[in-house]
Amino acid sequence: MKRTIGVLVLVFAVSGLAAAQSNPVMDSVRHIVQRQEKNLVGAAEEMPAEKYGFRPTAQQMTFGTLVMHVTESNHFLCAKLSGDTPAKLELKPTDAKTKLVAAMKSSFSYCGTALAKVNDSGLGEQVKVWGGREMPKAGAAIGLTDDLADHYSQAAMYLRLNGLLPPSAKKKGE
C-alpha cells in the first residue's frame, strides 16, 4: 500500500512538473520581452525630449524613429503570433516624447496580453509577415526577441553618444 501511494505521488509530481514546463519556448520569449520592455522603456524615458531627433549619422534612424519602430514592430509581431489583426498606429517619429513613450508602453502591454495566448504547440503554424512572406510562428517569436535586442543595443549606443547611461548599465537604485 505504501509503495502504491509512493508511486502515485511520484506520478503526480512528475506530471505536474511536465505541465509546468509544457511551454518552455514561449515562456522564454515572454521572459525576454519583459526584460527588453524594462530596458527599452527605460531608454526611451532616459533620452531627453530634445534629443529624440538625434541620429549618429545621416543614414541612421533618429531616436524618435527608433521608439516608433519598436512600438510598431511589437504590435505587428505580437498580433501575428496571437492571431489578432495588427493595430493601425498613428505615430510619427516627430511626435512628442510623451506620446512616443506612452505608445511604446502600450505596445509592450499589448504584447503581454497577446503572447499569453500563444503556446509552444502552435509555433509550427505559418503566419504572413512583412511583404506577405510566410514563416512559422516560431520564426516570428525569434524575430521579436531579436528585434528587441537589436534595437535596445541601438538605443543604448544613442544614449551613450549623448553622455547618458543605458538602463542595463546602471547600478540598482540609480
Residue ranges and their predicted role:
Residues 6-16:
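Bacterial N-terminal signal peptides
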